[in-house]
């Protein structure tokens, strides 16, 4: 079973969230999100926009949406893919890491709703998304936000398709028949990142345990 999400048509029920930052100082992170038209030359399309300024060595910016109507107790293997729009060129240097190659796009499907919870003075994800370039058991690295343009050229927004990957862990559907698709940007670049999520796809393959 493969499900496709086209965010040109609207938010599809997806909502934004942020983690790996201290909420007491949220204003300096300049966290922004919403469904909006893409910048030129892609202005004929729309997508889910998310942006923030990484000031803490790490910042996770994400969207989540529910997938309903599954059989409770069924088990599945998970493959995910996304398409993004990015204006970040390749091969640049930046504080903490490259603005393109050190911002990793991750996605996964979970039975538990992914939320940011307080841990000491920071908000952390309640699921295992891994850390920066490393996948977690519940979210896999699909690529980064660097586009095809070299750093020496002027910035231009481009679409970038990130190929499907399997998450390390499968899922078992909860009693409510609902699972959650998570897609986000895990930043090691200590400045502003802006990215649009334009499409996503999820393939659920019944596993022997189901």
Residue ranges and their predicted role:
Residues 1-28:
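Extracellular carbohydrate-recognition regions
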Residues 84-101, 113, 189-192:
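Extended, low-complexity, turn-rich repeat/linker tracts enriched in Gly/Pro/Ser/Thr and Asp/Glu
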Residues 55-71, 160-168, 197:
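Short beta-strands within extracellular/lumenal beta-sheet-rich domains
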Residues 33-62:
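Surface-exposed, low-complexity/disordered Ser/Thr/Gly/Pro/Asn-rich loops and linkers
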Residues 74-91, 183-185:
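A short beta-strand element within beta-rich, extracytoplasmic domains
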Residues 104-151:
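Beta-strand-rich interaction/scaffold domains
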Residues 155-161, 173-174, 187-208:
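Extracellular carbohydrate recognition
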Residues 143-167, 181-192:
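Short beta-strand-plus-loop segments that form exposed binding edges in beta-rich domains
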